[in-house]
Amino acid sequence: MSEGVDLKELKRRMDGAIAAFKHDIASLRTGRASANVLDPVTVEAYGSRMPLNQVANITVPESRMLSVSVWDKSMVGAVERAIRESNLGLNPIVDGQNLRIPLPELNEERRKSLVKVAHDYAEKSKVAVRHVRRDGMDDLKKAEKDGEIGQDESRAQSERVQKMTDDVISEIDRLLAEKEKEIMQV
């Protein structure tokens, strides 16, 4: 008798959806400074577009300030332009080879739009988890149809897959609620 569906593999794929969600919401700017805020910024450098963290070092010297130390002095202008044009609402101040970026207070409208973006990220992750669940259920149906597992085993495994799915989705909801609270905190 075969085991029907590889639960460890399904769990690994669902955990991947959680990890992607955590990465997505980490880049959402809250009231506190975080180097992740600049993750979406790409710089025109050496003939191609590169992530900011590949041409500069990003630090958080104060709770409402980011510091970007550009490694190549000739890139300072391109880095400043990339940050200004990134639609993050940031205005860097050039200081030699460094850029200081004060983080303004978020207004109510901006906070609500960030919460909406967080909800979109959560929904995208839930859809990914449901796709993994569907793949697992399809594998179970095929194994049962091919006679690899019995009906009782198929039912038991499908319940385990459903429980795993419910647990992962509730973890995504918990992380979303946490991030929403963090964003709305004044």
UniProtKB/Swiss-Prot annotation:
Protein name: Ribosome-recycling factor
Annotated Gene3D superfamilies: 3.30.1360.40, Ribosome-recycling factor (1.10.132.20)
A cellular-component GO term for this protein: cytosol
Domain of life: Bacteria
Gene Ontology molecular function: ribosomal large subunit binding
Region (Disordered), start-end ranges: 135-164
Family recorded in the similarity comment: Belongs to the RRF family.
Presence of the UniProt keyword NAD in the record: no
Localization in the cell: Cytoplasm
UniProt keyword terms in alphabetical order: Cytoplasm, Protein biosynthesis
CDD domains registered for this protein in UniProt: RRF
InterPro entries linked to this entry: Ribosome_recyc_fac, Ribosome_recyc_fac_dom, RRF_sf
